């Protein structure tokens, strides 16, 4: 076991994490040169295109060090984005060490720091590495100072490398072997294995990626998953080098995969503990928690007959993404669709993009909402994730909304505009620190303000230099109201929005004005109203199209004209009683665009 090193790589987006992983695999001969391709470990097209890692992957490599010994290196590639922070913490808890990759030309950024703190809390040894030193703009001294200043670990002997050219990659591996401790664990103890990730394979069912903490596992053993208590016979075990290779046994300290004929991905939860069915471990490994969706949105097919296809596509996505939740939902305006729960905005975009791309769906998405905790006047508490399900104002005692702690990092030139943005979003400042030219701001902001467009606006006010990460803090009482849109006195459920009272009039007016432009003129007047409960806060009128009934009157008495006008008015009144207004699909999309401003 002294020759095993389990490590992962922590980095902000675009600091070269996947490229460094590619180089390490190449140096260790994990893949022949002809099989090498960019971003070997990012298997989804969308991961490659956006340059992000979504699912954790592993590679078991062997490396002959300069001291002549052969070491087994297990690289666990982690997602870097804040939406997947739980998966990151599981990947990190399976390691003893982490390479902290920092772009020498850009210094420390938000997600680096967030994941690095997670690593330090889990007791993982952090090894700093400066990447991209071949760039003309590289400033290693500055980057080292930032690492020491912001994260507070000693980086004076940080290894310098360039993952693109392969320069210094062996030095990185040597530093890794020297600084990272070998795994602890007892191969003879009862089996405890941590599920780092799991995915669905069409041929063998669920594949679980595990780190064996104690004990030994062999094929044909019967295993038990401790969160659910379900039992399965093991069919295959092995390691990825990044290609899969079957083995006869996996023992303490190793990272590998288990295939046990599990049909449902929800059975193999990330962070759960695997043990033997007969000789079970006394207790599971710490840190397991159920992942709860934070952001909800309705997904509706543009064509009503695509509903079944959408359901099948969601089922298939769910096979590979246990954190996606969905349930059927009916809207009078948009027909049949699904209410889906996501971990965060990036997760939502990825699911939408995969539905559109891999399954060829045309979708309408309603505005993203968060989950509110509503205390009703009879004392019961309900969780509301859909504006249409919000009780009437008279039955509500108090509404609590989720608050998140946001950490922002930016060059000091942009502090002013970022603070202004946070204040507009009802944020309250907790902390502000200067690290050289970088500034770290900590704010508490309602989650609802973040899901709309916070990230895009942050990037635009800081010209792309600011980076952020957020984590859920608590539910806090807040004065939020539900704004309904009425057309000729009828509520349109899909257009309801939940906003803070201070913004309700402005938002109501804006949506009404937008709808006035979009709904075509009818043969009678159409009133568009925004209301909170029974209280109307905004109104727009669409004037009727009318025929000129006086065209045939030349001169003559005024009473004749009056009679014709009265008759027309009567007719319009009758039409208004029976007519219903068709709301075009664009109206819904327009509402979403109002929210993007």
UniProtKB/Swiss-Prot annotation:
It comes from the Bacteria. One of its GO terms (molecular function) is ribosome binding. Keywords: Cell inner membrane, Cell membrane, GTP-binding, Hydrolase, Membrane, Nucleotide-binding, Protein biosynthesis. Residues 2-184 form the tr-type G domain. It catalyses: GTP + H2O = GDP + phosphate + H(+). It is found in: Cell inner membrane. GTP binds at residues 14-19, 131-134. It is an enzyme of class 3 (hydrolase). Its EC number is 3.6.5.n1. It holds the Pfam family LepA_C. Its main location: membrane. Signal peptide: none annotated. GO terms for biological process: positive regulation of translation. It is a peripheral membrane protein. GO terms for cellular component: plasma membrane. Belongs to the TRAFAC class translation factor GTPase superfamily. Classic translation factor GTPase family. LepA subfamily. Required for accurate and efficient protein synthesis under certain stress conditions. May act as a fidelity factor of the translation reaction, by catalyzing a one-codon backward translocation of tRNAs on improperly translocated ribosomes. Back-translocation proceeds from a post-translocation (POST) complex to a pre-translocation (PRE) complex, thus giving elongation factor G a second chance to translocate the tRNAs correctly. Binds to ribosomes in a GTP-dependent manner. This is Elongation factor 4. The gene is lepA.
């Amino acid at each position: 076991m002294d020759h095993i090193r389990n490590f992962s790589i922590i980095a902000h987006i675009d600091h070269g994490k996947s490229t460094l992983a590619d180089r390490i695999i190449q140096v260790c001969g994990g893949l022949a040169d002809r099989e090498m391709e960019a971003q070997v470990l990012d298997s989804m097209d969308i991961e490659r295109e956006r340059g992000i890692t979504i699912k954790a992957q592993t590679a078991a490599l062997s490396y002959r060090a300069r001291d002549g010994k052969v070491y087994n290196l297990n690289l666990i590639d982690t997602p870097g984005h804040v939406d997947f922070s739980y998966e990151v913490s599981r990947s990190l808890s399976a390691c003893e060490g982490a390479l902290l990759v920092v772009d020498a030309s850009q210094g420390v950024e938000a997600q680096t720091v967030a994941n690095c703190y997670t690593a330090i809390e889990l007791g993982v040894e952090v090894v700093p590495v400066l990447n991209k030193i071949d760039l003309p703009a590289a400033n290693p001294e500055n980057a080292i100072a930032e690492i020491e200043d912001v994260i507070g670990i000693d980086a004076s002997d940080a290894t310098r490398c360039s993952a693109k050219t392969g320069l210094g990659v062996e030095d990185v591996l040597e530093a890794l072997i020297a600084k990272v401790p070998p795994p602890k664990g007892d191969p003879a103890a009862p089996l405890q294995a941590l599920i780092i990730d799991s995915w669905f394979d069409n041929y063998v069912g669920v594949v679980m990626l595990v780190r064996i903490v104690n004990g030994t596992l062999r094929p044909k053993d019967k295993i038990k998953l401790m969160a659910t208590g379900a039992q399965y016979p093991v069919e295959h075990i092995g390691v990825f080098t990044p290609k899969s290779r079957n083995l006869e046994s996996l023992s303490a300290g190793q990272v590998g995969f288990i295939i046990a004929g599990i049909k449902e991905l929800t059975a193999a939860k990330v962070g759960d503990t695997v043990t033997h069915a007969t000789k079970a471990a006394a207790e599971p490994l710490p840190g397991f928690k159920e992942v709860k969706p934070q952001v909800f949105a309705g997904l509706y097919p543009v064509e009503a007959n695509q509903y079944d296809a959408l359901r099948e596509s969601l089922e298939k996505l769910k096979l590979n993404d246990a954190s996606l939740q969905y349930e059927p939902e009916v809207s009078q305006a948009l027909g049949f669709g699904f209410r889906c729960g996501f971990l965060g905005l990036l997760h939502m975009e990825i699911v939408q993009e995969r539905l559109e791309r891999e399954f060829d769906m045309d979708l309408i998405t309603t505005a993203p909402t968060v989950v509110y905790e509503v205390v009703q006047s009879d004392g019961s508490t309900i969780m509301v994730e859909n504006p249409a399900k919000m009780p009437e104002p008279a039955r509500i005692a108090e509404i609590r909304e989720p608050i998140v702690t946001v950490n922002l990092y930016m060059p000091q030139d942009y502090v002013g505009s970022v603070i202004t943005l946070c204040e507009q979003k009802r944020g309250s400042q907790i902390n502000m620190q200067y690290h050289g030219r970088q500034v770290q701001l900590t704010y508490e902001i309602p989650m609802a303000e973040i899901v709309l467009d916070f990230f895009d606006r942050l990037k635009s006010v800081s010209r792309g230099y600011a980076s952020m990460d957020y984590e859920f803090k608590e539910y806090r009482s807040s004065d939020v109201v539900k704004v309904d849109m009425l057309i000729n006195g009828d509520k349109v459920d899909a257009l309801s929005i939940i906003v803070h009272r201070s913004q309700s009039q402005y938002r109501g007016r804006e949506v009404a004005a937008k709808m006035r432009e979009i709904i075509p003129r009818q043969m009678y007047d159409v009133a568009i109203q925004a209301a909170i409960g029974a209280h109307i806060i905004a109104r727009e009128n669409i004037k009727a199209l009318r025929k000129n009934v006086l065209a045939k009157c030349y001169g003559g008495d005024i009473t004749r004209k009056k009679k014709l006008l009265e008759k027309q008015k009567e007719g319009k009144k009758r039409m208004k009683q029976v007519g219903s207004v068709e709301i075009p699909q664009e109206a819904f999309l327009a509402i979403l665009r109002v929210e993007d401003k």
